[in-house]
Amino acid sequence: MTQVPNRETPRGIAILARFLASESAGGIVLMVAALAALIVANSPLSAGYFSILHSVWLGLSVELWINDGLMAIFFLMVGLEIKREVLAGGLASWGQRALPGFAAAGGMLVPALIYIAINWGNPQTLSGWAIPAATDIAFALGVLSLLGNRVPTSLKVFLAALAILDDLGAVTIIAFFYSAGLNLPMLAAAFVTLAVLIVMNRLNVRRLLPYLLLGALLWFFVLQSGVHATLAGVALALCIPMGKPEEEARSPLLFLEEKMHYWVAFAVVPIFGFANAGVSLAGITLGNLVDPVPLGVALGLFVGKQIGVFLAAVLAIRAGLAVLPEGSNWVQLYGVAMLCGIGFTMSLFIGNLAFPGSQHLIDEVKVGVLIGSGLAAIAGIVLLRSRFSRP
């Protein structure tokens, strides 16, 4: 008797492959990881969850390995994307950078001002001013992709470019405002390592292994120097050779970016989300939600982002410095500005840097980020699905 082949497994694999290849997959997986963290942190499993995060391995807690180690890989990916877009992508010319550049600047300035206004007079909480200034590129693009062809491709490109420039701004903020207690010998060692990487780039060394080995050494020196270790990822990315457009098939940067994409989207970022979104809601009242930190973060993300991004974009377009994305209208642009308030990954990350050693304030940041990002996602989807956003 001939055995009938089992077609279910290949079909299931095909469905999984299509999901992983979709634009929304990374955002959905991150959303699930964050929701799982919230559930676990408010269940009988919470003691084990927090115990694992605070357990020490090789001198660092698991939480620090995730935030300083795994996130360096995330920032390496961010750096690769920034370099690619600036050299040969959607940010290759000043004209292409204009609208997302102005919008990103407005989208960082206004949320920070709102947070500062709410926390004025409290030096301890004022240090969190940069928390609502960030946009989560995976989350925002994931939500936008759920809308399908309701949103023109030009707006998706605009949001991606804006988020990349936003990430560049966040990296700059971390470098200048959240690095303290410098260890000069280690910092010097980091600069020497970086200099070697730059020389390798100038000599057109195209093998990735030497870059990655020196990158790991650079990460160690930066970690010990007092500068935040994740910046080593960005520095390494900028040293990876891009090559000429006609050499795209042999580009070390494009090869590494392609190989890292799934690991970052479906492992690094979800692990970070699971480790950092868990906050116990026990004892939290409505009164706690209007404390300066969660209120400043939530309003900065939900209100500040949409106002800052949209207002800066309108001023740039009216001044003739930029043009409205092709095939889009003002309502659609405003809907995308709302989605920029999804600040999950980078906002939580900066929150950990702003309030080291204060679990209470970090928990307040988590609450503010979850509320602000959630409201921004819901409002953006509702507006972009409404009849007002149709061309």
Curated annotation (Swiss-Prot):
One of its GO terms (cellular component) is plasma membrane. It is found in: Cell inner membrane. It is a multi-pass membrane protein. Its main location: membrane. GO terms for molecular function: sodium:proton antiporter activity. Signal peptide: none annotated. It catalyses: Na(+)(in) + 2 H(+)(out) = Na(+)(out) + 2 H(+)(in). One of its GO terms (biological process) is regulation of pH. Keywords: Antiport, Cell inner membrane, Cell membrane, Ion transport, Membrane, Sodium, Sodium transport, Transmembrane, Transmembrane helix, Transport. InterPro entries: Na/H_antiporter_dom_sf (IPR023171), NhaA (IPR004670). The chain crosses the membrane at residues 25-45, 56-76, 98-118, 128-148, 157-177, 180-200, 208-228, 264-284, 297-317, 335-355, 364-384. It comes from the Bacteria. NCBIfam families: NhaA, PRK09560.1, PRK09561.1. Na(+)/H(+) antiporter that extrudes sodium in exchange for external protons. Belongs to the NhaA Na(+)/H(+) (TC 2.A.33) antiporter family. This is Na(+)/H(+) antiporter NhaA 1. The gene is nhaA1.
